[in-house]
């Protein structure tokens, strides 16, 4: 099973490495887009002299920046220099903008000089380090430049032409909207940046050079589908999902942080249909009205989208209509799904816990065991929020925790950055989304790692602050399993159990899911024993030998102290455990 996990992580790394070469340079793409929108012949302020800058930026500056960044990712400054030299060979060896070539030659240059250094660095005699380092970078870069000029450039040029022709054929066949069947689910799998900046941005820039705009910039950045789903929750949702959806709408639509609506979709997986329907209808409208943008819209905010639309009223209206249609369609589909739902309450926290368990099961793993880790101001000197791109939702999560840390009177810096830029430094607390934690641990094994389901709404932040201030230990940090063994339900006498209580500490989400799981098992086996949840502080009411209390390993000591006379079932996970079936098999009520 671990092979599947590593394969999934490798796929994520590939997509992330592509987007990480583009995203740090998005400012240059936007500058080029503004220059194009203003000064070309059909721009807002036509200027022949300034328009001459458009071509060199597209042909040389942008690809070299990508190649430089790709080399830097592999081997720092030396890798960046060699990657940039190699990229120039690909650029001059082709007649098309060499973005894909830069994505190949940049990392290749960094990898080559890295291997050279690993082999020869220790063999350099004292006093010759600068001479060898400078000449080795120059000669390796020179060799790769020749390779790129004669081999990589022409090959990539042919491939780029083929891909461009394929995209053009898809557009002409009116099949581009079908891409949203893949794009919308991919967002939740953390591939949105890889798709948008690793694939659509390079192809879109080439389309802008030829046609002045590109619809590809709108495929992933369209905020309409997410807006419609959040609006449906605001009207037809229940509980915390309904009350929190209004604020989420503002952050999503105007802030461009699309990750904020992912938990709402995962709460009701059928809402993937709403997201896909909205994406398909929005892209169809864009295609029908010949809409497009002049540069990437990053983040996917309606403000960024309007700012990068072509000159004129109609181009802006066409873009807005596509967003509106996507929002309306996703709202209607989501409204039908939510209206037909018969559950009494939508709990974001419970849905996030269930999502974490489902993801772990899909990877062939059990949910991470909860442990008590020693986190204090002595063991943590800085906190880093890490995600694919190092911006967006991680930046907002860092802002939320930074405010809590400041209010607690702690002087611990809280920042955000891309996982690919993490360093293996001790006394660092790294916060990542559960799906990305394996990669973060691989980059920084010496750090303390905390997994959250949602950067923008997590009770874990209060736990982190409480642990840092010494108020309480932080639970569910990735670490070793405690040596204390769980209490087997088969050791308990279950013939006289009158009630089952699922205990929880600060967060009720997983306890609620566990409670519902036990109830479902009891219904199937016709066991008429009430099942409920209770805070640890309320367990005194259930301190009886005919009460079964279910809890996790990390809370075992507190629960047994609160209700010493009760019977206990200690499990790894309140959401997914075989112990519930074993317990039910030994009950006769």
Swiss-Prot record:
Q: Which residues lie on this side of the membrane: Extracellular?
A: 48-51, 158-166, 295-316
Q: What EC number(s) is this enzyme filed under?
A: 2.7.1.197
Name where it's found.
Answer: Cell membrane
Q: Which UniProt keywords apply?
A: Cell membrane, Kinase, Membrane, Phosphoprotein, Phosphotransferase system, Sugar transport, Transferase, Transmembrane, Transmembrane helix, Transport
The reply on keyword Transcription regulation is no
Q: Where are the transmembrane segments?
A: 26-47, 52-72, 136-157, 167-187, 275-294, 317-338
Annotated Gene Ontology cellular component terms: plasma membrane
Q: How does it sit in the membrane?
A: Multi-pass membrane protein
* Location of Phosphocysteine modifications: 387
Alphabetized InterPro entries for the sequence: PTS_EIIB-like_sf (IPR036095), PTS_EIIB_2 (IPR013011), PTS_EIIB_2/3 (IPR003501), PTS_EIIB_mannitol (IPR029503), PTS_EIIC (IPR003352), PTS_EIIC_2 (IPR013014), PTS_IIC_mtl (IPR004718), Sugar_PTS (IPR050893)
Q: Which GO terms describe its molecular function?
A: kinase activity; protein-N(PI)-phosphohistidine-mannitol phosphotransferase system transmembrane transporter activity; protein-phosphocysteine-sugar phosphotransferase activity
List the CDD domains: PTS_IIB_mannitol
Q: Topology: which residues are Cytoplasmic?
A: 1-25, 73-135, 188-274, 339-589
Q: Where is the PTS EIIB type-2 domain?
A: 381-476
Where does the UniProt entry say this protein principally localizes? membrane
Keyword Ribonucleoprotein assigned to the entry: answer is: no
Q: What does this protein do?
A: The phosphoenolpyruvate-dependent sugar phosphotransferase system (sugar PTS), a major carbohydrate active transport system, catalyzes the phosphorylation of incoming sugar substrates concomitantly with their translocation across the cell membrane. The enzyme II CmtAB PTS system is involved in D-mannitol transport.
Q: Which PANTHER family match?
A: MANNITOL PERMEASE IIC COMPONENT, PTS SYSTEM MANNITOL-SPECIFIC EIICBA COMPONENT
What NCBIfam families would the database entry show?
A: mtlA, PRK15083.1
Known partners and oligomeric status: Homodimer.
Q: What is this protein called?
A: PTS system mannitol-specific EIICB component
The lineage, from the top, is: Bacteria, Bacillati, Bacillota, Bacilli, Lactobacillales
Protein encoded by which gene = mtlA
């Amino acid at each position: 099973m671990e092979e599947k996990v590593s394969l999934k992580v490798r796929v994520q790394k590939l997509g992330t490495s592509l987007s990480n070469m583009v995203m740090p340079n998005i400012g240059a793409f936007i500058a080029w887009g503004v220059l194009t929108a203003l000064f070309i012949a059909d721009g807002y302020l036509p200027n022949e002299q300034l328009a001459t800058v458009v071509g060199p930026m597209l042909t040389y500056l942008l690809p070299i920046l990508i190649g430089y960044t790709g080399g830097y990712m592999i081997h720092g400054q030396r890798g960046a220099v060699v990657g940039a030299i190699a990229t120039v060979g690909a650029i001059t060896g082709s007649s098309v903008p060499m973005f894909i070539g830069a994505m190949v030659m940049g990392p290749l240059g960094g990898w080559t000089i890295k291997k050279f250094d690993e082999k020869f660095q220790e063999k350099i005699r004292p006093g010759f380090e600068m001479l060898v380092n400078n000449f080795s970078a120059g000669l390796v870069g020179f060799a790769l430049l020749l390779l790129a000029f004669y081999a990589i450039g022409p090959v990539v040029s042919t491939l780029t032409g083929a891909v461009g022709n394929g995209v053009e054929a898809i557009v002409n066949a009116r099949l581009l909207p079908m891409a949203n069947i893949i794009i919308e689910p991919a967002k939740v799998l953390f591939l949105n940046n890889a798709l948008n900046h690793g694939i659509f941005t390079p192809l879109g820039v080439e389309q802008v050079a030829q046609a002045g705009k590109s619809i590809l910039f709108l495929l992933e950045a369209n905020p309409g589908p997410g807006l419609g789903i959040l609006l449906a929750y605001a009207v037809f949702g229940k509980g915390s999902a309904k009350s929190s959806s209004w604020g989420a709408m503002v952050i999503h639509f105007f802030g461009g942080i699309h990750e904020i609506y992912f938990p709402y979709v995962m709460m009701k997986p059928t809402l993937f249909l709403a997201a896909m329907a909205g994406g398909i209808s929005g892209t169809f409208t864009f295609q029908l009205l010949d809409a497009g943008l002049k540069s990437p819209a990053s983040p996917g905010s309606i403000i960024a989208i309007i700012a990068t639309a072509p000159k004129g009223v109609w181009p802006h209206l066409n873009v807005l209509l596509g967003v509106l249609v996507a929002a309306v369609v996703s709202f209607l589909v989501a409204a039908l799904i939510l209206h037909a739902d018969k559950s009494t309450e939508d709990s974001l926290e419970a849905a996030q816990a269930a999502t974490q368990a489902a993801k772990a099961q899909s990877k062939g793993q059990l949910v991470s065991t909860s442990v008590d880790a020693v986190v204090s101001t002595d063991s943590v000197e800085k906190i880093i929020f890490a995600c694919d791109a190092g911006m967006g939702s991680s930046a907002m999560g860092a802002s939320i925790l930074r405010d809590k840390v400041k209010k607690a009177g702690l002087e611990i810096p809280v920042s955000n950055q891309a996982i690919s830029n993490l360093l293996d430094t001790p006394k660092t607390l790294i916060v990542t989304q559960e799906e990305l934690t394996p990669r973060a641990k691989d980059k920084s094994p010496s750090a303390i790692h905390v997994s959250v389901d949602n950067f923008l709404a997590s009770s874990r932040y209060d736990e982190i602050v409480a642990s840092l201030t010494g108020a309480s230990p932080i639970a569910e940090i990735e670490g070793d399993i405690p040596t204390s063994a769980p209490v087997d339900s088969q050791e308990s006498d279950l013939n006289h159990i009158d009630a089952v209580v699922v205990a929880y500490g600060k967060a009720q989400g997983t306890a609620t899911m566990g409670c519902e799981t036990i109830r479902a098992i009891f219904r199937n086996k016709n066991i008429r024993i009430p099942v409920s949840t209770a805070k640890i502080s309320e367990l005194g009411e259930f301190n009886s030998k005919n009460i079964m209390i279910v809890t996790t390993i990390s809370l075992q000591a507190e629960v047994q102290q609160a209700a010493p006379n009760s019977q206990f079932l200690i499990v790894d996970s309140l959401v997914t455990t075989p112990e519930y079936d074993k317990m039910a098999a030994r009950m006769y009520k």
